[in-house]
């Protein structure tokens, strides 16, 4: 790899890390191309990305940034999963690691916090931002729905009573 390519790769990693809510480091020793392709497509579906980069270049990219603790995790054949949603990359990586033993979670960085394997697994169990937004909208709209039902209930009951009297008089 030429120096210009390395500089470009480091710049790309820096911009990806700046936008990332979480950076998950995985060890992918023995992962086939087909398995890697499946993992990348699952990451893309979740709004995350999965990149294999040289550890030295990744260390240069995180140097002087809040994600600097990440460099402690970069040993051996590693790959980086990033996502703006703090849960997405961790969730996909943990789910894939459960079915494929060749992918090993090393750790992660969320903001300035270094997470170990247990921390990444705990993060993967949290609901995503979209799920949380859906729950909040449901909680906000539930009282309004109940109010509307309560207001409509007496009118419906009156209509049924009048209908019963009309049916009784007709009989």
Curated annotation (Swiss-Prot):
Keywords: Ribonucleoprotein, Ribosomal protein, RNA-binding, rRNA-binding. One of its GO terms (molecular function) is structural constituent of ribosome. The keyword Cell inner membrane does not apply. It comes from the Bacteria. GO terms for cellular component: large ribosomal subunit. Gene3D superfamilies: 3.30.70.1730, 6.10.250.290. CDD domains: Ribosomal_L10. The keyword Nucleus does not apply. GO terms for biological process: translation. Forms part of the ribosomal stalk, playing a central role in the interaction of the ribosome with GTP-bound translation factors. Part of the ribosomal stalk of the 50S ribosomal subunit. The N-terminus interacts with L11 and the large rRNA to form the base of the stalk. The C-terminus forms an elongated spine to which L12 dimers bind in a sequential fashion forming a multimeric L10(L12)X complex. HAMAP family: Ribosomal_uL10. Belongs to the universal ribosomal protein uL10 family. This is Large ribosomal subunit protein uL10. The gene is rplJ.
């Amino acid at each position: 790899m030429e120096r210009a390519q390395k500089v470009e790769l480091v710049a790309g990693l820096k911009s990806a890390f700046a936008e990332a809510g979480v950076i998950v480091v995985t060890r992918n020793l023995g992962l086939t191309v087909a398995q890697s392709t499946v993992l990348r497509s699952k990451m893309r579906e979740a709004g995350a990305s999965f990149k294999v980069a040289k550890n030295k270049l990744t260390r240069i990219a995180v140097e002087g940034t809040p994600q600097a603790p990440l460099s402690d995790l970069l040993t051996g054949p590693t790959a980086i999963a990033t996502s703006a949603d703090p849960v997405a990359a961790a969730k996909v990586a943990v789910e894939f690691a459960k079915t494929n033993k060749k992918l090993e979670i090393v750790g992660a960085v969320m903001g300035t916090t270094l997470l170990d394997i247990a921390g990444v697994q705990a993060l993967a169990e949290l609901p995503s931002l979209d799920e949380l937004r859906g729950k909040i909208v449901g909680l906000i709209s539930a009282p309004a729905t109940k109010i509307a039902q309560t207001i409509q209930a007496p009118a419906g009951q009156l209509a049924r009573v009048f209908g019963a009297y009309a049916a009784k008089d007709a009989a």
